[in-house]
Amino acid sequence: QFIRDLSFENAAVQNGVVAQGQPEIQVQVALDARKRTVENQYDVIMKLKIESKTKEDAPKSIFLIELEYGGVFLIENIAEQQLHPFLMIECPRMLFPFVRRIISDVSRDGGYPPLNLDQIDFVSLYRQQIAARAAQQPQGSA
């Protein structure tokens, strides 16, 4: 497992924003999996973009965390048709506790209460990605 990229921008301090009350937290998640040159090894990368904003008519950014966290997985004895779902559901599920801790630590070290991410439903995320990919493919002519 490894941190590929980590960024924390404390916009509130930089721009003099004073946060009143509970902020709005937006979380975006993207997943990627690639075969490595070593047989049966795969890189799985989880990309998170987390933005905290004030709850106003014109919201202002409080902080932004961007994290790319990866794992190298040796996968054997899995049927070919089950490999992609395994890489995009089970592998991220194994990485998530570490991602959650990093996000919590970074937000706390940035001077804010620790941000404890809710569990991510990787099955739903996978289904959404499959549906989006199917919608982008051109339809055959009748």
Residue ranges and their predicted role:
Residues 1-94, 98-142:
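N-terminal intrinsically disordered, cationic/polar leader segments
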